[in-house]
């Protein structure tokens, strides 16, 4: 029993806690002592120089208090205010559970409007309302037709007339960013800020410290910020309580993603794919691997040996 617990609270050599784990995301980006990390991320999202936001970013409370009896409590991942010409309140949410994406999107929109209401100062007019932006780091496209890595939504009517510019929703598909980085298929497709953002978002998905450090080297940022981020990763990797919680989260997420992929396999078979077809199995293996599902779980789902799986991955 003791050995089992010891294994649960320690990472393998070279492994790291993924930043798409919401607690790790908060530790990295919702840290008032090292606000420069979050400032750098926001500068890439909003396509401005780091210096334009330096000293203007302030973390807000993650919890919204309410006196209403029975009102659902909420705690956001990161909430920040930027005072730059206007006031911008920004909610950042990270999620990798594809199965519940609609429910999660509804929750995040609720957070957005609730935050806007709680930050309206009594003496201000409604014209003076802060801008409130929601930034989702997800593993899916909202618009499945366009399939854009960076999606942007505003309140508008069916003819395209904007109802209010005070609210915006950004959806960033971090899994697609990871795939673009992994296959070295991002260069020349984006402008410099977006290219850096693709790499930053890819870094949220990696599970090896070597890969994380390699990605950071490719991103334009101050050396001291890079060192801070690398230091934060090392701290988290040696936090046994956090590692235990991360492993529980990862196991659950693997089960959810594996069940989704199994459902997709059944649908594919119904459309005429035979169970034993090599190409079909290869695609399933690669899809599960890209979703950071363990070799053991892939083996159970595909009936392939771990050696066969490694050969497919390394082809």
Predicted regions: what is each one?
Residues 41-45, 54, 58, 108-110, ...:
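Generic preference for flexible, low-structure residues
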Residues 1-170, 175-180, 185-187:
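Accessory alpha/beta interaction modules
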Residues 2-19, 23, 81-95, 202-315:
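Short, charged alpha-helical interaction segments and adjacent helix-coil junctions
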Residues 15, 31-36, 190-194, 219-226:
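Generic detection of long, well-ordered alpha-helical segments
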Residues 165, 172-222:
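An acidic, glycine-/histidine-flanked metal-binding catalytic module
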Residues 42, 108, 112, 197-204, ...:
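Short amphipathic C-terminal alpha-helix that caps PH/PH-like domains
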């Amino acid at each position: 029993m003791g050995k089992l617990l010891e294994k649960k609270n320690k990472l393998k050599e070279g492994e790291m806690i993924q930043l798409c784990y919401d607690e790790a995301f908060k530790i990295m980006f919702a840290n008032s002592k090292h606000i420069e990390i979050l400032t750098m991320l926001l500068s890439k999202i909003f396509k401005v120089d780091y210096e334009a936001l330096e000293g203007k970013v302030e973390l807000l409370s993650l919890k919204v208090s309410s006196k209403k009896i029975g009102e659902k409590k909420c705690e956001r991942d990161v909430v920040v205010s930027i005072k730059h010409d206007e006031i911008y309140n920004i909610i950042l949410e990270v999620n990798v559970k594809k199965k519940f994406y609609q429910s999660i999107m509804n929750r995040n929109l609720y957070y957005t409007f609730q935050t806007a209401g709680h930050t309206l100062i009594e003496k201000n007019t409604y014209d003076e309302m802060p801008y409130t932006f929601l930034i989702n780091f997800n593993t899916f496209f909202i618009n499945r037709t366009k399939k854009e890595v960076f999606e942007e939504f505003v309140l508008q009517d069916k003819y395209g007339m904007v109802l209010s510019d005070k609210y915006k929703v950004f959806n960033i598909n971090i899994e697609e960013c990871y795939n673009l980085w992994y296959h070295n298929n991002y260069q020349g497709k984006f402008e410099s800020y977006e290219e850096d953002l693709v790499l930053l978002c890819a870094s949220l998905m990696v599970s090896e410290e070597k890969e994380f450090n390699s990605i950071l080297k490719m991103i334009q940022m101050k050396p001291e910020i890079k060192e801070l981020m690398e230091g934060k990763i090392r701290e988290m990797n040696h936090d046994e309580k956090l590692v235990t919680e991360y492993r529980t989260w990862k196991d659950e997420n693997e089960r959810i993603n594996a069940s989704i992929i199994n459902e997709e396999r059944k649908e594919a078979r119904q459309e005429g794919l035979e169970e034993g077809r090599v190409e079909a199995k290869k695609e399933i293996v690669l899809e599960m691997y890209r979703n950071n599902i363990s070799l053991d779980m892939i083996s159970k789902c595909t009936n392939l040996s771990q050696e066969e799986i490694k050969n497919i991955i390394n082809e």
